[in-house]
């Protein structure tokens, strides 16, 4: 027997959003993701559902190649507010870098992700709503991670090459 998805009602969206938020707080990103897909099936441009879906996908990052970075990226690029898009794309790159750091990935693969997160947070900070320092807070967290992990430093990568070094024969 084939089971088919059922559609929620338009009037049920606010309650579905509340449930999706609750499941995120309970660290159940798969449930949040499912609810967001139900909302987006009837209202494809729902901004809160898009934002939560993107974040629910990043909540599942483990630092492996199977992480759904591209999917989260395409979802978050559908955000129409430029500040929100930049801010959440910054979080996307930050979370990917942190997951890869926890997974023990090579430091040289992480620095570009942190740098892209910082670029997004910097641009978001320039256009942030008055009184909203979220992008600054995320910027500072990324900088602290870089300071606390000297292997991630671009300077470290550059100092490993000496002028008298030559390529292997």
Task: Label each PLM-derived region with a short phrase.
Residues 2-4, 126-169:
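Terminal, low-structured helical/coil segments at or just beyond the last alpha-helical repeat
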Residues 10-15, 43-57, 81-103, 133-145:
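Amphipathic alpha-helical repeat scaffolds of TPR domains
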Residues 25-59:
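N-terminal interaction modules that seed assembly of large macromolecular complexes
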Residues 57-78, 88-123, 145-163:
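Short coil/linker segments at helix-helix boundaries
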Residues 1-7, 30-36, 69-73:
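Repeat-mediated protein-protein interaction surfaces in helical alpha-solenoids
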Residues 42, 78-79, 127:
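Structural marker of alpha-solenoid helical repeat scaffolds
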Residues 1-15, 77, 108:
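TPR-adjacent "capping" and linker segments in tetratricopeptide-repeat scaffold/adaptor proteins
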């Amino acid at each position: 027997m084939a089971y088919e998805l059922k559609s929620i009602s338009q009037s049920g969206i606010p309650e579905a959003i509340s449930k999706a938020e609750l499941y995120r707080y309970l660290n159940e990103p798969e449930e949040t993701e499912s609810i967001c897909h139900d909302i987006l099936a009837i209202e494809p441009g729902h901004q809160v559902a898009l934002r939560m879906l993107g974040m629910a996908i990043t909540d599942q990052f483990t630092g492996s190649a199977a992480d759904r970075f591209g999917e989260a990226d395409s979802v978050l690029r559908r955000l129409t507010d430029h500040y929100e898009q930049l801010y959440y794309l910054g979080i996307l790159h930050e979370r990917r870098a942190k997951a890869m750091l926890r997974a023990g990935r090579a430091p040289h693969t992480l620095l570009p992700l942190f740098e892209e997160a910082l670029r997004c947070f910097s641009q978001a900070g320039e256009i942030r709503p008055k009184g909203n320092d979220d992008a600054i807070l995320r910027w500072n967290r990324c900088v602290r991670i870089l300071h606390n992990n000297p292997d991630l430093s671009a300077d470290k990568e550059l100092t490993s090459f000496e002028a008298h070094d030559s390529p292997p024969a």
